[in-house]
């Protein structure tokens, strides 16, 4: 699929996509959040959230105004996985160029559309490589697959194909870890609800305040709407997949 199939290619396309997914109200609010960011962030109280028995600090950055969206927890989650991998001298691939916007990293990055130094512009389902990875990590990328493009075919099948492709690139003891928001992509939500995503392990985070997230049981997170009551994601799934047998 060529880049013109991407719904948010170009400035006009990106504005149209943003309004379609998040509403015109967010189009109005976003510039004010960006302008206010350098004033607001220094005064924000440090917060933490629990994940797998430990505490991780929320992450506030001006880029993408992480202090008012799910990146506040997704970036720390991504860094947690990278730290685990670094302790084991693991080979890492990130699918979707996200963490590079918030600091320097030396792992491989694959992104179908975003051009940046060192980023491999390939589709994960067709990428040919002899390399195998201990960890494949993806931050809020899989919900866009088949949903934010004009290519024919259902999103669910494409998401499952991308998961299968990632798992096939893992070393025997490797794992794929992804974060996805609930309530954004209806087909992805149905996969999760029906236990058809195929994850081996999963953890759910629910937003209880503008910058307050808590790990909750599956039934507490399912059905959480996107964009209400707080902007953007109000619940996340962190899913892990093992290498195929």
Regions found by a protein language model. Give the residues of each.
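Boundary detector for helix-to-coil junctions that initiate low-complexity/charged tails
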Residues: 1-19
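Class I SAM-dependent methyltransferase Rossmann-like catalytic core
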Residues: 20-86
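S-adenosyl-L-methionine-dependent methyltransferase catalytic module, highlighting the catalytic core
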Residues: 65-68, 145-245
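Glycine-rich SAM-binding Motif I of class I
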Residues: 75, 100-102
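Conserved class I S-adenosyl-L-methionine
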Residues: 86-99
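Hydrophobic/aromatic residues located in beta-strands of well-ordered beta-sheets
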Residues: 92, 107, 176-178
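Adenosine-cofactor binding site in Rossmann-like domains, unifying the SAM/SAH pocket
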Residues: 102-138, 151, 157-161
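A conserved beta-strand element that flanks and buttresses the S-adenosyl-L-methionine
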Residues: 137-142, 146
């Amino acid at each position: 699929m060529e880049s013109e199939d991407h719904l948010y290619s170009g400035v006009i396309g990106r504005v149209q996509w943003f309004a379609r997914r998040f509403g015109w109200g967010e189009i109005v609010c976003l510039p004010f959040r960006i302008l206010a960011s350098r004033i607001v962030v220094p005064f924000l109280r440090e917060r933490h959230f629990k994940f797998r028995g430990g505490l991780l600090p929320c992450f506030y950055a001006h880029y993408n105004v992480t202090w008012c969206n799910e990146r506040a927890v997704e970036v720390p989650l991504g860094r947690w996985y990278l730290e685990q991998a670094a302790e084991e001298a693991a080979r890492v691939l990130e699918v979707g160029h996200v963490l590079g916007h918030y600091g320097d990293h030396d792992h491989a990055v694959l992104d179908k559309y975003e051009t940046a130094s060192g980023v491999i512009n390939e589709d994960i389902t067709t990428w040919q490589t002899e390399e195998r990875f201990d960890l494949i990590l993806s931050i809020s990328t899989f919900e866009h697959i088949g949903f934010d493009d004009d290519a024919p075919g259902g999103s669910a099948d494409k998401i499952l194909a991308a998961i299968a492709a990632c798992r096939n690139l893992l070393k025997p003891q490797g794992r794929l870890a992804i974060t996805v928001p609930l309530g954004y992509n209806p087909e992805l939500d149905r996969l999760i609800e029906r236990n058809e995503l195929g994850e081996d392990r999963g953890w759910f985070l629910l937003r209880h305040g503008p910058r307050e997230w808590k790990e909750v049981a599956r039934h507490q997170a399912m059905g959480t709407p996107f964009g209400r009551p707080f902007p953007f994601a109000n619940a996340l799934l962190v899913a892990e997949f093992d290498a195929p047998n």
